């Protein structure tokens, strides 16, 4: 009936108040954890004003920010302010390192999606990172009818105090393709017992 009547406006006095949106220039986790221990930036990329979706995949060196292995408490990824936050639709920043014994390790130092905040591990859970490695940036940009020159996504990392060893260690979010053939995982290789410890 309302639509057939031409969708007349209701009583403006009954309009709900606008929700308080977070300040896009600030780290959302900073209100809980303080400023991050360090921030890394992606290589600059110019987002074209009018085009199809744009993918930016690059590697950057990770060195000089920590001097020993440390446990990550939380991470957050966002576009630069003010325009980068408008064009970065979603993305991942993955730190790849060696553990000193020749074993490769990897874990996220930032994941972003529209409307998503940062990622904080539960108390007593941390992700171990090493002083040197490579950050793989995989960023999806969507044009906004305005060129955004030299956009640099930013990944913020909060660490546990030096010397802290959490009860549980995680590698964060991991990607794999089940049933992918020889050498790959099969669906029945992954067993998640009910009521077990959850670290994400």
Spans of features found by a protein language model:
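Aromatic- and Gly/Pro-enriched helix-to-coil junctions and flexible linker segments
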Residues: 1-62, 132-138
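Extracellular and analogous surface-interaction loops
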Residues: 59-71, 125-130, 161, 188-200
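Extracellular secretory-pathway ectodomains of glycoproteins
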Residues: 147-200
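A surface-exposed loop-and-adjacent beta-strand signature within N-terminal beta-sandwich domains
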Residues: 82-124
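Extended, low-complexity, turn-rich repeat/linker tracts enriched in Gly/Pro/Ser/Thr and Asp/Glu
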Residues: 66, 79-87, 143-148
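Short edge-strand/loop segments of extracellular domains
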Residues: 79-82, 92-101, 154-166
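Extracellular beta-rich ligand/substrate-recognition surface
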Residues: 47-54, 112-117, 178-183
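Noncatalytic modules at the cell exterior or secretory-pathway interfaces
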Residues: 72-75, 126-144
